[in-house]
Amino acid sequence: MDTIAITVDCSADDFEQVAAFWSAALGYERVLPSYLIDPAGVRPRLAFEIVPEPKVVKNRWHVDLYVENLDELEPRVRELVDLGAVVLHHLDEVTQGFTNVFTTLIDPGGNEFCVCAPH
């Protein structure tokens, strides 16, 4: 089986803050300054790479963090904000018979991600 690592591009100015944020947010171990692993060895690894160009548009893809139930959504969002994330918006809608409840945030490097409740 292949090992999956997700690489996050960062500026030199926010590299440390972004890596520290995701380590704390996911409970990952920081094995190198630019590399995080899941202590259980189950979830994808995260790598951080310093790039010279600034982020100028919305991500073409993003990470969704799922909580176990709707009651956990708001506390999880507060926890991530305390770690340095910023809330962009919250959505609670019914689409094609499914209830979508999620909050979109950005990490300290400006990368979008969502905290979602199961539908």
Regions found by a protein language model. Name each.
Residues 14-29, 80-82:
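Amphipathic alpha-helical segments
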Residues 8-9, 34-39, 74-78:
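N-terminal start-of-chain detector that recognizes signal peptides
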Residues 4, 43, 50, 79-81:
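Macromolecular interaction modules
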Residues 1-19, 61, 116-119:
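N-terminal beta-strand motif that seeds the catalytic metal site of vicinal oxygen chelate
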Residues 26-61, 67, 108, 112-117:
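Conserved short beta-strand elements that form part of the metal-binding/catalytic scaffold
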Residues 15, 63-109:
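Vicinal oxygen chelate
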